[in-house]
């Protein structure tokens, strides 16, 4: 086996998905702790303690205790090299999360065991279904009072339509949480309270019938034996093939805050989750074992380092090996670029990448030429598909407090729209600037970032826009006629793409009927 294949086989690239507040950022912290990347994990709540969670690294996230942007972290675990993408749990940032899920080979789904399956989890699972992404499940918060574990698994099976195979099973919960039984290893791992910031050196008791178990946990031992008979009869056995097809999920129980059960998940991901997978392009499927380099950009982040006022494009490597100083072909603009300063990430800590392999995420410095969805190759004219921009659902007019700063405002808005967090539209026949977003929180984020990063103070005003659609036509004459007749509803987005800005849904439907040769698109790929 070649050294290249060994490197590809080692990679595990996954994202964590959950409903807000299910404990996703805490799990990210603990996963890093096991990867020896952090000696003492920061907690998300109690932000005044100064020990902020490592993956929530933008100022605004630190203030609010929510993850707004996708963080990327790489760390070794056992014989694997893990690339973990932490996605925003907050609802308004679903586009960012959606695009992140195009860059991973498996997902860890985190569920709050007191609440069960929640709305956001359902939506995210629909996205993973599009590519049959394998899912590992973690039932979190066992150190609190929880719902019945069998009931929780039934809910996952019925609502998310995926079979559950328990790998670990909880013994007690809340103040009486004693630990878990590992079904595949036939061993009980005991929980120690108050070890949330360090790796627990847990006591392990081999075998359900071991008398040591009765000594250690008293009557819970017999309850566990009785329960296991029921569980084994009522649940699925783990089946690797079904897992890889996205039909079955291994289920682990634990508490991220108490740092218990996280290593069990990591063991499962390293053992079962797939190596980097082939990727679809407009020409063919690209295999990870191909020698020529290729990759696509799924995210752009401005001002990762306020000291440098920079923008970084996050690229998933799909095939070949990145080497410092190599020449890449930027397919959309048809230019070759030399890349000598790509970055690897430890959540905001950036290091220069010496080399990168399929499954790795590298950062390219972006001076305004790279867009979300762009493909880079070693010359081949192919384009990876499936990294969309979505039409926003909410709109506001944005206005300056100081009219002399129009230039800075436009620059800031265009850069923020390149990140895909919001979209900016410039109407063809007015000087207005319209901001479009998926949710209200995004509007707040934009005003705050304009102020802190671009020194521009802006306010919003209501505007009668119901929706926007990107417009195209194969018939250039018909497009010109459409532009002439509908100019008061047309705008250019941040990438200068023609967009129809509809005041009402009725107006949009009438226009679509009136102009059958014009395509009104809800999504757009670069």
Curated annotation (Swiss-Prot):
<dbReference type="GO" id="GO:0005525">
    <property type="term" value="F:GTP binding"/>
</dbReference>
<feature type="domain" description="tr-type G">
    <location>
        <begin position="9"/>
        <end position="277"/>
    </location>
</feature>
<dbReference type="InterPro" id="IPR031157">
    <property type="entry name" value="G_TR_CS"/>
</dbReference>
<dbReference type="GO" id="GO:0016150">
    <property type="term" value="F:translation release factor activity, codon nonspecific"/>
</dbReference>
<dbReference type="Pfam" id="PF22042">
    <property type="entry name" value="EF-G_D2"/>
</dbReference>
<feature type="binding site">
    <location>
        <begin position="140"/>
        <end position="143"/>
    </location>
    <ligand>
        <name>GTP</name>
    </ligand>
</feature>
<feature type="binding site">
    <location>
        <begin position="18"/>
        <end position="25"/>
    </location>
    <ligand>
        <name>GTP</name>
    </ligand>
</feature>
<dbReference type="InterPro" id="IPR053905">
    <property type="entry name" value="EF-G-like_DII"/>
</dbReference>
<dbReference type="InterPro" id="IPR032090">
    <property type="entry name" value="RF3_C"/>
</dbReference>
<dbReference type="InterPro" id="IPR038467">
    <property type="entry name" value="RF3_dom_3_sf"/>
</dbReference>
<dbReference type="GO" id="GO:0097216">
    <property type="term" value="F:guanosine tetraphosphate binding"/>
</dbReference>
<dbReference type="GO" id="GO:0006449">
    <property type="term" value="P:regulation of translational termination"/>
</dbReference>
<dbReference type="InterPro" id="IPR009000">
    <property type="entry name" value="Transl_B-barrel_sf"/>
</dbReference>
<dbReference type="InterPro" id="IPR035647">
    <property type="entry name" value="EFG_III/V"/>
</dbReference>
<dbReference type="InterPro" id="IPR000795">
    <property type="entry name" value="T_Tr_GTP-bd_dom"/>
</dbReference>
<keyword id="KW-0963">Cytoplasm</keyword>
<dbReference type="GO" id="GO:0005829">
    <property type="term" value="C:cytosol"/>
</dbReference>
<keyword id="KW-0648">Protein biosynthesis</keyword>
<dbReference type="InterPro" id="IPR005225">
    <property type="entry name" value="Small_GTP-bd"/>
</dbReference>
<dbReference type="Pfam" id="PF16658">
    <property type="entry name" value="RF3_C"/>
</dbReference>
<dbReference type="InterPro" id="IPR004548">
    <property type="entry name" value="PrfC"/>
</dbReference>
<keyword id="KW-0547">Nucleotide-binding</keyword>
<dbReference type="GO" id="GO:0003924">
    <property type="term" value="F:GTPase activity"/>
</dbReference>
<keyword id="KW-0342">GTP-binding</keyword>
<dbReference type="Pfam" id="PF00009">
    <property type="entry name" value="GTP_EFTU"/>
</dbReference>
<comment type="function">
    <text>Increases the formation of ribosomal termination complexes and stimulates activities of RF-1 and RF-2. It binds guanine nucleotides and has strong preference for UGA stop codons. It may interact directly with the ribosome. The stimulation of RF-1 and RF-2 is significantly reduced by GTP and GDP, but not by GMP.</text>
</comment>
<comment type="similarity">
    <text>Belongs to the TRAFAC class translation factor GTPase superfamily. Classic translation factor GTPase family. PrfC subfamily.</text>
</comment>
<feature type="binding site">
    <location>
        <begin position="86"/>
        <end position="90"/>
    </location>
    <ligand>
        <name>GTP</name>
    </ligand>
</feature>
<dbReference type="GO" id="GO:0016149">
    <property type="term" value="F:translation release factor activity, codon specific"/>
</dbReference>
<dbReference type="InterPro" id="IPR041732">
    <property type="entry name" value="RF3_GTP-bd"/>
</dbReference>
<dbReference type="InterPro" id="IPR027417">
    <property type="entry name" value="P-loop_NTPase"/>
</dbReference>
<protein>
    <recommendedName>
        <fullName>Peptide chain release factor 3</fullName>
    </recommendedName>
</protein>
């Amino acid at each position: 086996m070649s050294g290249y294949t060994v490197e590809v086989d080692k990679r595990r690239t996954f994202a964590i998905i959950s409903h807000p507040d299910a404990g996703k950022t805490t799990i990210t912290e603990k996963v890093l702790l096991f990867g020896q990347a952090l000696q003492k994990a920061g907690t998300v709540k109690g932000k005044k303690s100064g020990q902020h969670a490592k993956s929530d690294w933008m100022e605004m996230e630190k203030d609010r205790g929510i993850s707004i942007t996708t963080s990327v972290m790489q760390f070794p675990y056992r014989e694997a090299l893990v690339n973990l993408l932490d996605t925003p749990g907050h609802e308004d940032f679903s586009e960012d999360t959606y695009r992140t899920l195009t860059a991973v080979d498996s997902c860890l789904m985190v569920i709050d065991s007191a609440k069960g399956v929640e709305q956001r989890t359902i939506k995210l699972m629909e996205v993973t279904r599009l590519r049959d992404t394998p899912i590992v499940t973690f039932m979190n918060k066992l150190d609190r009072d929880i719902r019945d574990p069998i009931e929780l698994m039934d809910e996952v099976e019925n609502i998310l339509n995926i079979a559950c195979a328990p790998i670990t099973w909880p013994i007690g919960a809340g103040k009486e949480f004693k630990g878990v039984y590992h079904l595949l290893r036939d061993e009980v791992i005991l929980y120690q309270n108050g070890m949330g910031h360090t790796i627990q050196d847990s006591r392990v008791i081999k075998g359900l019938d071991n008398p040591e178990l009765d000594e250690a946990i008293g009557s819970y031992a017999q309850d566990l034996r009785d329960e296991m008979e029921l569980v084994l009869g009522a649940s699925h056995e783990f089946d690797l093939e079904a897992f890889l097809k996205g039909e079955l999920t291994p289920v682990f129980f634990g508490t991220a805050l108490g740092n218990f059960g996280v290593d069990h998940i990591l063991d499962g991901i390293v053992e079962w989750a797939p190596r980097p997978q082939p990727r679809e392009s407009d020409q063919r499927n690209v295999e990870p074992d191909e020698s020529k380099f290729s990759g696509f950009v799924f995210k752009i982040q401005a001002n990762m380092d306020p000291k440098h006022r920079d923008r970084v494009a996050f690229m998933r490597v799909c095939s070949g090996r990145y080497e410092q100083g190599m020449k890449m072909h930027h397919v959309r603009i048809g230019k070759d670029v030399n890349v000598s300063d790509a970055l690897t990430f430890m959540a905001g800590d950036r290091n220069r990448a010496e080399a990168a392999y399929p499954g790795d995420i590298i950062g390219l410095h972006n001076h305004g030429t790279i867009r979300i969805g762009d493909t880079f190759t070693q010359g081949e004219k192919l384009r990876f598909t499936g990294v969309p921009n979505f039409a926003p659902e909410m709109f506001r007019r944005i206005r300056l407090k100081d009219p002399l700063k129009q230039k800075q405002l436009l620059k800031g808005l265009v850069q923020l729209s390149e990140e895909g967090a919001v979209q900016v539209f410039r109407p063809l026949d007015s000087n207005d600037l319209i901001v479009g977003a998926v949710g209200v929180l995004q509007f707040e984020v934009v005003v705050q970032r304009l102020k802190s990063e671009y020194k521009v103070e802006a306010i919003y005003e209501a505007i009668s826009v119901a929706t926007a659609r990107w417009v195209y036509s194969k018939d250039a004459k018909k497009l010109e006629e459409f532009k002439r007749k509908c100019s008061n509803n047309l705008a250019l987005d941040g990438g200068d793409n023609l967009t129809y800005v509809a005041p009402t849904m009725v107006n949009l439907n009438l226009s679509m009927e009136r102009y059958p040769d014009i395509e009104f698109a809800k999504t757009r790929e670069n």
